[in-house]
């Protein structure tokens, strides 16, 4: 990741921490990474139910963030989820995923790698903060 993206990456992590809706991820390691980052929002894993049921459950939170991985499968899942969620009265955030992908794709394959990248970024951007956050 380029140094000029460190601040924006940290802002996106803060956005995840402050999010109060439901976050949709692919699997348990993605959930663990988000919890390690301090995310307190409801996390719904795709590995448990059909997409139509996931969309219904997630929409009940009023606000939904799609955080699938950055590979072809993750892209396809994100597109399908967006289509399912269009039929529900909820706000869908797919932009956070797109921005994370844009600034971090060279460093990580997916959501499960966010925590490791975060630790790396804070140690490089401000070594005095390592271990504090």
UniProtKB/Swiss-Prot annotation:
One of its GO terms (molecular function) is metal ion binding. InterPro entries: TOPRIM_dom, TOPRIM_RNase_M5-like, UPF0292. Gene3D superfamilies: 3.40.1360.10. It comes from the Archaea. PROSITE patterns: TOPRIM. Mg(2+) 1 binds at residues 26, 69. The keyword tRNA processing does not apply. Mg(2+) 2 binds at residues 69, 71. Its cofactor is Mg(2+). Residues 20-100 form the Toprim domain. Binds two Mg(2+) per subunit. Pfam families: Toprim. Keywords: Magnesium, Metal-binding. PANTHER family: UPF0292 PROTEIN MJ1624 (PTHR39964:SF2), UPF0292 PROTEIN TK1411 (PTHR39964). Belongs to the UPF0292 family. This is UPF0292 protein TON_0187.
């Amino acid at each position: 990741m380029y140094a000029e993206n460190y601040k924006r990456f940290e802002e996106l992590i803060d956005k995840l921490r402050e999010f109060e809706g439901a976050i949709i991820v692919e699997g348990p390691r993605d959930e663990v990474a988000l919890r390690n980052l301090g995310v307190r929002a409801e996390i719904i894993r795709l590995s448990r139910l059909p997409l139509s049921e996931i969309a219904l459950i997630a929409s009940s939170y009023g606000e939904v963030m799609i955080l699938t991985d950055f590979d072809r499968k993750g892209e396809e899942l994100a597109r399908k989820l967006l289509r399912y969620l269009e039929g529900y009265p909820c706000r869908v955030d797919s932009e956070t995923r797109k921005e994370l992908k844009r600034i971090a794709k060279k460093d990580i394959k997916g959501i499960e790698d966010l925590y490791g990248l975060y630790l790396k970024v804070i140690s490089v951007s401000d070594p005095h903060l390592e271990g504090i956050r």
